[in-house]
């Protein structure tokens, strides 16, 4: 396949290319990589500490200045990293920041039983994705400055926003499964909190809880995959189970091990990217502010599951069954999102389902093996959907202005096949789309309720056993408050 990095690198190795010692190049890469990773982390630390100073809070102008400087520094360093990688024909640049955990075997010194290296990987996949993150987050930050002007939660929004940027950068550049999981958790936490941003109303916290529950399922699957990889290889460094450079790499795992780990990774990606049957949380996430809807669920966070599959694509390709499952999930999600978008009455929900249909196609491309096509699709779709979300608040005004200018109502566009269908088919289609394929009802009846019933039974048994051992009277048997809230949320 055509390799832009290699072609440009070969051109740069001519007589005009600078000759740089490897030590100097490594030092430069480490400095630039430290800026890319450290800028959003430092931004979060500064804004987080400042938010704790209630007596002297930062002004809106100061907060925006910090955000602009932090994102601009990270973007410049990422672009500089890309330029030097092209010029020196480096398609993979690992950067390590030391070993945080190091446990040896008791019987020999041949290998480590557990080895946690804080490592980042700059390659053909991570560099474009992290540049996209900085570009879109910078755009959203400038938009949010005006959109949230004089809002009560202005400072809170940008604290969570900086946490999201740090999580996205960490996940994108992760070179170990532990580093990836830490960034994955930061993205999920900031996303759920921003869905519940307007906590004065009952709907945003409830929808934020729904998003958090789905993310917990996704996080559990990713954690199980990380534990399995540690059990198989002794550490989470990608080099221990992935060979070669992306996208032409391979895996050192056996087919059975690859299928098990790949299935867990697929579940994690499905939850993060709202694939069927976890698609119900995406329209609920629109309760958050428009800037967070644009950057999270329209451009970046919703693509994180696809990025995870691209990163571990050599493992997925070990199993044709797993690849077929990815294609099936992606196509089913695309079809589901297409007919659900047709009945939405607000533009943000319609755009969320439009994003979901494209992410479903991206999953199908990954399952087929079109890795570069999937990456290009992510980059283009993220930019387009961000523009549409930012345009949404003024679209209705412009729509009415256009109707006033032409003196009549604009015609409504509907599917040609649907307009020619019998009334019974159209009613059935509308009901199915309005109920979102009844997926939420099925999940509630066949997954959530049995799960909560099991937990309540375990809680009741534990209370009886405790009362018997302590010879105390019968305590009031009830589920904990958190379980009660979860039950009322789903019922």
Predicted segment positions?
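...captures the hydrophobic TM-helix bundle architecture rather than a specific catalytic motif
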Residues: 2-491
């Amino acid at each position: 396949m055509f390799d832009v990095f290699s072609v440009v690198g070969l051109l740069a190795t001519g007589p005009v290319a600078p000759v740089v010692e490897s030590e100097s190049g490594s030092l430069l890469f480490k400095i630039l990589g430290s800026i890319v990773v450290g800028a959003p982390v430092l931004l979060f630390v500064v804004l987080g500490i400042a938010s704790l100073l209630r007596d002297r809070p930062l002004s809106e102008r100061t907060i925006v200045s910090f955000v602009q400087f932090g994102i601009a520094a990270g973007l410049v360093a990422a672009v500089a990293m890309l330029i030097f990688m092209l010029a020196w024909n480096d398609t993979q640049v690992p950067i390590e920041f030391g070993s945080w955990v190091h446990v040896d075997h008791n019987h020999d010194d041949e290998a480590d039983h557990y080895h946690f290296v804080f490592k980042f990987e700059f390659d053909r996949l991570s560099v474009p994705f992290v540049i996209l993150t900085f570009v879109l987050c910078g755009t959203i930050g400038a938009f949010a400055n005006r959109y949230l002007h004089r809002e009560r939660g202005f400072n809170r929004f940008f604290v969570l926003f900086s946490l999201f940027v740090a999580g996205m950068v960490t996940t994108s550049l992760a070179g170990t499964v532990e580093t990836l999981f830490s960034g994955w958790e930061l993205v999920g936490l900031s996303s759920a909190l921003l869905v519940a941003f307007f906590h004065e109303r009952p709907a945003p916290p409830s929808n934020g809880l729904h998003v958090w529950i789905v993310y917990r399922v996704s996080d559990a699957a990713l954690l199980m995959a990380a534990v399995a990889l540690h059990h198989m290889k002794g550490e989470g460094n990608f080099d221990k189970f992935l060979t070669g450079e992306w996208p032409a790499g391979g895996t050192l795992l056996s087919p059975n091990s690859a299928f098990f780990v790949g299935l867990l990774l697929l579940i994690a990606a499905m939850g993060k990217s709202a694939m069927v049957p976890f698609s119900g949380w995406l329209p609920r996430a629109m309760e958050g502010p428009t800037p967070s809807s644009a950057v999270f669920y329209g451009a970046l966070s919703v693509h994180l599951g696809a990025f995870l599959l691209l990163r571990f694509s050599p493992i997925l390709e070990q199993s044709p069954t797993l690849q077929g499952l990815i294609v099936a999930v992606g196509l089913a999600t695309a079809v589901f999102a297409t007919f659900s978008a047709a009945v939405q009455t607000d533009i943000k929900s319609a755009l969320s389902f439009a994003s979901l249909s494209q992410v479903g196609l991206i999953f199908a491309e990954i399952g087929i093996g079109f890795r570069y096509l999937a990456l290009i699709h992510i980059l283009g779709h993220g930019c387009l959907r961000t523009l549409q979300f930012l345009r949404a608040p003024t679209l209705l005004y412009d729509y009415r202005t256009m109707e006033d200018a032409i003196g009549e109502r604009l015609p409504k566009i509907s599917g040609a096949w649907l307009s020619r269908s019998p009334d019974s088919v159209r009613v059935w289609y509308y009901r199915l789309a309005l109920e979102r394929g009844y997926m939420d009802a099925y999940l509630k009846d066949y997954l959530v309720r049995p799960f909560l019933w099991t937990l309540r039974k375990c809680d009741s048994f534990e209370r009886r056993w405790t009362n018997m051992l302590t010879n105390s009277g019968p305590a009031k048997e009830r589920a904990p408050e958190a379980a009660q809230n979860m039950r009322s949320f789903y019922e």
